[in-house]
């Protein structure tokens, strides 16, 4: 409400965690109804296919190649240098989960002992820069589409 009261009519929540998607989507039902215009839940990845940027993974998973590359691009000092020797399991128990055909959720400990659910060893600052650039360009493209902002609620 506070943002809308200031006159903003183009509002997007840039979501940085997959676990937040469902609760944000549920909240947007009431928010959109109350405000009378659409507010969007947009993952910062904005639908970018990460696979062309990656060597050992096809998509983002916790502390894997994508996330570690992004943090390296932001500030290398935040990443423990031992990441080059670490990897974890993919997080999915089946190909169906890995490709997104279905999902379920568990405590992190049931998937990984070290918090890594991907191939952090394949991360690089260069990949992180390229991914961040692709995400930003896609966010601009998506959010600049005027059709989004005229959808009735």
Predicted regions and their residues:
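Extended, histidine- and acidic-residue-enriched regions that form the cofactor-binding/catalytic faces
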Residues: 1-12, 18-153
């Amino acid at each position: 409400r506070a943002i809308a009261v200031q006159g903003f009519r183009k509002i997007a929540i840039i979501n940085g965690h997959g676990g937040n998607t469902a609760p944000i989507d549920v909240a947007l039902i009431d928010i959109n109804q109350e405000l009378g215009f659409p507010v969007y839940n947009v993952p910062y990845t904005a639908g970018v296919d990460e696979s062309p940027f990656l060597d050992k993974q096809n998509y983002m998973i916790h502390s894997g190649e994508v996330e570690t590359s992004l943090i390296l691009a932001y500030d290398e000092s935040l990443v423990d240098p031992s990441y080059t020797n670490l990897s974890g399991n993919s997080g999915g128990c089946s190909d169906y989960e890995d490709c997104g055909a279905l999902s379920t959720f568990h405590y992190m400990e049931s998937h990984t002992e070290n918090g890594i659910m991907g191939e952090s060893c394949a991360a690089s600052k260069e990949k992180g820069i390229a991914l961040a650039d692709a995400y930003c360009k896609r966010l601009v493209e998506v959010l600049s589409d005027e059709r989004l902002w005229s959808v009735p609620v």
